[in-house]
Amino acid sequence: MLIIIISILGVIFLITWGVITYLGRSQTLSVKSVENLNKDLYLIHLTKPDNMTWKSGSFAKIELADTKESQQNVSDTVSGATRNSKGKEQKSRWLTIASNPDEGEILILTHNSGSFYKKTLADLTAGTEVKMSWLDSGLSLADDKEVLVCFASDVGIAAIRPIIKELEGKREIILSHLDKGVTVFNEELIELANKTTNLIYKTDTDLSQSKETLKNAIDKYENKATYFLAGQPDDVKLMKTFLKDNGIDSKNIKSSSFRGLK
């Protein structure tokens, strides 16, 4: 009996170690280009290794090459990260991948908050190398036929865009984007909605409009739909409360907060 228990524990250990090794493995990527879309908003294009894949809506740890230490004591508006206890800037952040593997490149949509990491990221030139590891996703669907209702605020659209591109035409999808000036994927999503009968895409200027869109979906689908929320933490929290107050079960709500966006 003891031998069996030890064997089972050994198998569990090997599986756990394998998962950690797989998720934590690092790959070196090259910068293709960096677009300054407006003011502090940037779209970063990275090369995609042929053997690299990920789930739509995934995030990953992006590590920059060794750089000079910053003297500014500021925080990162997207990740919320600050200096470590020794006063040094961390050179890695968790960022959402705004593209799918079949697009042939890795897209990162982010604000330049003024932190050393974000300023360095925004100033990267073509050919510069970064490291990516720990690919993961908190947005997933259990049923391949259920309706998907999405809310994204600000750069939270980065998490929702690849999901829409993967699933458009395969199920009914409703997307409300509280864009706050982040319109980089707007034309693309409008075009998808125009040619896809079961895709509704709305851009909203305030939270009340987004609530109205979601309320219409709640009245129609109730708990027969899955609700994805992504973006500014305060917005995500408010929308999560709004869904629950209107009878949506917590198990049907999945979220991805961009910590630090205020």
Predicted features, each with a name:
Residues 2-24, 113-262:
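FNR/FR-type flavoprotein reductase catalytic core
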Residues 14-126, 179:
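Ferredoxin-reductase
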